[in-house]
Amino acid sequence: MSFPTCARCRRERCVLSVASAWPSVVAPALSALALQYPQLELRFDVQDRLVDLVNEGVDLDIRVGDDIAPNLIARQLAANHRVLCASPQFLARHAPPKQLSDLAALPCLVIKERDHPFGVWQLHSKEGQHAIKVTGPLSSNHGEIVHQWCLDGQGIALRSWWDVRENIASGHLVQVLPDYWQPANVWAVYVSRLATSAKIRTTVEFLRHYFQLHYPQHEPTASAVGRGD
């Protein structure tokens, strides 16, 4: 995919931030961006909190979820969702959940993400929205750690479809309660309008095309592998 040359981006520094659960997804995209636009100087910060774009000098924050303050400008980079999953070994030791309330009695792997309530999974289904309180012996603020624990059979995780799709296809993970999911759309959030900042416009457009190419949209209900019952 080709992009127009951005002469005004020369020797421009662009500071980006992302939640601690997402660096492995964003880092390859920024590497490709750097190859395409060597005149851009990129700084990539990983944060486990919401950043103050103005006071912290951040040009672009990549956020997951649709809850964005109205004073900020946002453009959706990709549609995504999270699914509930566990390893076959875990499901052999524990009765697979048959309804959402069963999660309260099972070990769950909880991620502390920015301003999200800890241990409360906000899920969607065809019937509407649901909130379930979950607990477990292991928790982290890093998605890759929780992903590995899930593969190790330590509990049920709520993970991005992007992260677990290959594990589910290979049988290393099994999707449970597939009628439930959590929206996890990816947004570029910034304070300067794209028309006034060539470096931000170039970065946002590149990331949007990159995610569309590497992470095509996948409907939540189409991702079901098994109900675990």
Where are these regions (language model features)?
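C-terminal effector-binding regulatory domain of bacterial HTH transcription factors
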Residues: 161-166, 170, 180-229
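Short beta-strand-to-loop elements that line the ligand-binding cleft
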Residues: 42-46, 110, 132-142
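Alpha-helical linker/hinge and terminal dimerization helices associated
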Residues: 1-7
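Ligand-binding cleft/hinge of the Venus flytrap
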Residues: 33, 119-133
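Short beta-strand->loop
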Residues: 74-77, 170-182
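A ligand-binding cleft/hinge motif common to bilobed small-molecule-binding domains
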Residues: 147-172
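Flexible hinge/capping segments at coil-to-helix
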Residues: 71-82, 86-111, 126
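Central regulatory/effector-binding core of bacterial HTH transcription factors
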Residues: 11-70, 220-226
